[in-house]
């Protein structure tokens, strides 16, 4: 396998904190709805690029998160040009690790056996008129 690349179009969703409830004396944890649906969408897109056999060895991941431009950026021609060139980057919450958590979870048992196999990870945040998440996965050779 050379590499797996795919793009998830639409506004990226950061992994939210799990919600807990007690039923019949037991604690049940669940994903917030937005996170759950985003993971399902990522899995749907990734399933079109899945390898013939699930990857069982170490992998590297490169994730680029393109967030929608806020009005403060899109209303200013200079800021918009800088953002489109990648010179003006989002430094506000959510953090990059919260974006990638959902993506990694969505790929479990689909691309790789478990997200613990990710040994190299690069995540970048950008602004764009076309919000999306670009994912590239490579097997790491020993």
UniProtKB/Swiss-Prot annotation:
Entry GO MF terms: magnesium ion binding
SUPFAM superfamilies the UniProt entry points to: Holliday junction resolvase RusA
UniProt record, GO biological process: DNA recombination; DNA repair
Residue ranges the record marks as coiled coil: none
Biased composition (Basic and acidic residues): 81-94
Region: Disordered, residue numbers: 70-94
Protein's name according to its UniProt entry: Uncharacterized protein YqaN
Encoding gene, per UniProt annotation: yqaN
């Amino acid at each position: 396998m050379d590499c797996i690349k795919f793009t998830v179009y639409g506004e990226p969703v950061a992994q939210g904190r799990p919600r807990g409830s007690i039923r019949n004396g037991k604690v049940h944890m669940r994903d917030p709805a937005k996170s759950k649906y985003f993971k399902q969408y990522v899995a749907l897109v990734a399933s079109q690029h899945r390898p013939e056999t699930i990857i069982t060895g170490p992998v590297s991941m490169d994730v680029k998160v393109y967030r929608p431009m806020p009005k403060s950026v899109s209303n200013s021609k200079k800021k918009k040009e800088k953002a489109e060139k990648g010179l003006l980057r989002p430094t506000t919450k959510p953090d990059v690790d919260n974006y990638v958590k959902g993506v990694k979870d969505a790929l479990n048992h689909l691309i790789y056996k478990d997200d613990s196999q990710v040994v190299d990870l690069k995540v970048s945040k950008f602004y764009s008129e076309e919000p999306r998440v670009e994912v590239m996965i490579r097997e790491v050779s020993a």
